[in-house]
């Protein structure tokens, strides 16, 4: 990596010849593959945008000119060219994130990680520039299906009214995470096939100047195109056709698998693809849906462009046929669409990751809960993890559980999960959300016969006295460990599996007061507005002392789960210490 080692800023790039920059592009690809193989990350999106990013930094003048990448998952080349190559070559400096982060560099204007936001952010930057009387280029790069998101349409509509410099680069690699979905992409296909000359041009209807480049991986042509619009005085769209996974044959041939991959998959030209994958809650879900669909054709499976993230594999999608619907990157629409299906007699199952539920609050409240639509929403990745700060799964409990009419369930094992799914699909009284447990499936081998229509009834797993442990969902495993630790110390605790996030079992809580003086709540999410605070509020000024355990209301960035557990005192030993201090009257934060 002779050339890359010499690049510490875009200024160094501008000194290179065309031949040297093409060589640099190959070195950058080696850096991308090195990082992804060692720590995982977005592979094929970054391989496809190498030349375009080099051309951007060669033609424009970052950080004076502002680059705003949609999602920013395709920022690896950008980072290598802006002084952060240590995150990609050699042993990898892991504190370099896989997304834009202003704390790392002035070349990253925003913290980014969710989709379809670039046009809104960039148009705001451009408008402020005009108000301030400044003069620089504002460039938004959007691709990988992000144009299908509602905010992208809104941003595109608003930015078209700017009478000043605003450059949109549409990175058209013919893919979202999986296949592109929706009518917009039919128009992009028509534009590609006509070399950008079709009179049916989505962007021109908004009033944008439009330029098409067929070979979006040709560095020289990209530099020519970008130079032609530099310092333009009106909004313009540059539509570049790129190859997702370019330069690494396995990623070119399997774009979806290599969109975002785990470490250890890359071995020269032969990818390491695991076989005999273990059972997961995702595979349990798809197997269940397929069996139900064989018996009931009204069942519909829905995703918002993240089929892999919710285990909707290609095989599953093919078997479901028209009953599988990918609504593209449009979670807000997905919630409304799901409500419409349910209200008209279908049985929709929308699978979505916790972090993306945040985008849909109004649709959950208005379109689903207010209408009491009997939807089933499966929430994946809810809980603490070592993920970056843009994809945290710790806010869904507080958000969803405080909306009226919603029933939010927290299974602790495979059998409960299947029972909840079956009940939710067949009942017609409530909107139901189910928080999928984190980690490997736990199985009891016994069918769960709970009647979930009897709302907010907790299960007493082990009856005792003195201390009651109410352990929600994924943290039921922690609850059992706390139970064992207290038992070891001579306590006779009660262990409770609440199953319901959205309500409290008042009868049970009242009975606990007879033989218990301490209640512990455990939840895998933030405490503020969460499950445990409802228990504490119910006990109010009674003699029951309540210890709530969960996360702090904060954005954590790639912090190890074990470190988070220590930080939040989520270990059996630390919880035991708190119980002992509370009994002696020395606990200050009870």
What are these regions, as identified by a protein language model?
Residues 39, 65-68, 111, 132-149, ...:
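A short, small-residue-rich loop immediately preceding and capping a beta-strand
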Residues 42-162, 299, 304, 313:
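Cofactor-binding active-site loop characterized by glycine-rich and histidine/acidic residues
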Residues 1-80, 215, 239:
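N-terminal amphipathic, basic-rich helices that act as targeting or association modules
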Residues 86-96, 161-175, 369-381:
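A glycine-rich helix N-cap at a beta->alpha junction
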Residues 108-264, 270-278, 282-287, 406-516:
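Glycine-rich ThDP/TPP pyrophosphate-binding loop and its adjacent helix/strand module
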Residues 30-37, 96-112, 133-139, 314-325, ...:
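Glycine/charged-rich beta-loop-alpha catalytic/anionic-binding loops adjacent to active sites
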Residues 272-275, 386-388, 406-407, 526, ...:
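Peripheral docking tails and interdomain loops at the edges
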Residues 248-357, 363-373, 471-473:
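Non-catalytic terminal/interface segments that mediate subunit docking, oligomerization
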């Amino acid at each position: 990596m002779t050339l890359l080692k010499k690049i510490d800023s875009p200024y160094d790039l501008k000194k290179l010849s065309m031949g040297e920059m093409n060589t640099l592009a190959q070195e950058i690809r080696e850096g991308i593959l090195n990082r992804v193989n060692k720590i995982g990350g977005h592979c094929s999106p970054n391989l496809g945008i190498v030349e375009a990013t080099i051309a951007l930094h060669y033609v424009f003048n970052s950080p004076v000119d502002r680059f705003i990448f949609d999602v920013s998952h395709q920022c690896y080349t950008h980072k290598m060219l802006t002084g952060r190559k240590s995150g990609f070559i050699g042993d990898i400096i892991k504190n370099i994130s896989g997304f834009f982060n202003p704390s790392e560099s002035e070349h990253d204007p925003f913290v980014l990680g969710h989709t379809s936001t670039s046009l809104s952010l960039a148009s705001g930057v451009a408008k402020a520039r005009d108000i301030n009387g400044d003069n620089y280029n504002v460039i938004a790069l959007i691709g990988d299906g992000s144009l299908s998101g509602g905010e992208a349409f809104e941003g595109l509509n608003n930015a078209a009214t700017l009478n000043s410099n605003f450059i949109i680069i549409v990175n058209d690699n013919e893919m979202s995470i999986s296949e592109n979905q929706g009518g917009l992409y039919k128009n992009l296909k028509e534009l590609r096939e006509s070399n950008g000359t079709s009179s049916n041009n989505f962007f021109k209807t908004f009033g944008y100047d439009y330029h098409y480049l067929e070979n979006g991986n040709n560095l020289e042509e990209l530099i020519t195109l970008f130079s032609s619009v530099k310092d333009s005085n009106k909004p313009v769209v540059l539509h570049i056709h790129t190859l997702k996974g370019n330069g690494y044959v396995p990623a070119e041939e399997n774009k979806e698998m290599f969109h975002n991959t785990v470490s250890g998959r890359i071995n020269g030209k032969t990818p390491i693809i695991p076989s005999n994958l273990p059972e997961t809650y995702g595979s349990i879900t798809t197997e269940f849906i397929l069996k139900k669909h064989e018996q009931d054709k009204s069942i519909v499976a829905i995703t918002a462009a993240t089929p892999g993230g919710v285990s909707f594999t290609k095989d599953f999608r093919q078997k479901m046929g028209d009953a599988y619907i990918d609504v593209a990157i449009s979670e807000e629409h997905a919630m409304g669409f799901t409500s419409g299906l349910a209200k008209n007699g279908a049985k929709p199952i929308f699978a979505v990751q916790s972090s993306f539920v945040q985008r849909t609050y109004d649709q959950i409240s208005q379109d689903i809960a207010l209408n009491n639509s009997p939807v089933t929403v499966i929430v994946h990745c809810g809980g603490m993890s070592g993920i970056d700060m843009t994809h945290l799964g710790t806010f869904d409990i507080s958000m969803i559980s405080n909306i009226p009419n919603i029933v939010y369930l927290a299974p602790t094992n495979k059998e409960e999960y299947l029972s909840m799914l079956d009940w939710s699909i067949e009942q017609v009284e409530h909107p139901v959300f189910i928080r999928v447990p984190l980690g490997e499936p736990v199985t009891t081998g016994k069918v769960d016969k709970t009647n979930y229509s009897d709302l907010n009834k907790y299960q007493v797993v082990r009856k005792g006295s003195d201390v009651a442990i109410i352990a929600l969902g994924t943290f039921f495993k922690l609850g059992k460990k706390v139970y064992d630790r207290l038992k070891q110390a001579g306590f006779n605790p009660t262990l409770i599996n609440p199953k319901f996030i959205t309500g409290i079992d008042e009868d049970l809580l009242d009975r606990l007061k007879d033989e218990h003086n301490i209640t512990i709540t455990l939840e895998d999410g933030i405490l503020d507005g969460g499950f445990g605070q409802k228990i504490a509020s119910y006990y109010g000024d009674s003699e029951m002392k309540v210890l709530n355990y969960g996360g702090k209301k904060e954005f954590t960035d790639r912090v190890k789960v074990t470190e988070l557990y220590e930080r939040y005192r989520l270990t059996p030993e630390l919880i035991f210490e708190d119980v002992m201090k509370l009994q002696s009257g020395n606990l200050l934060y009870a």
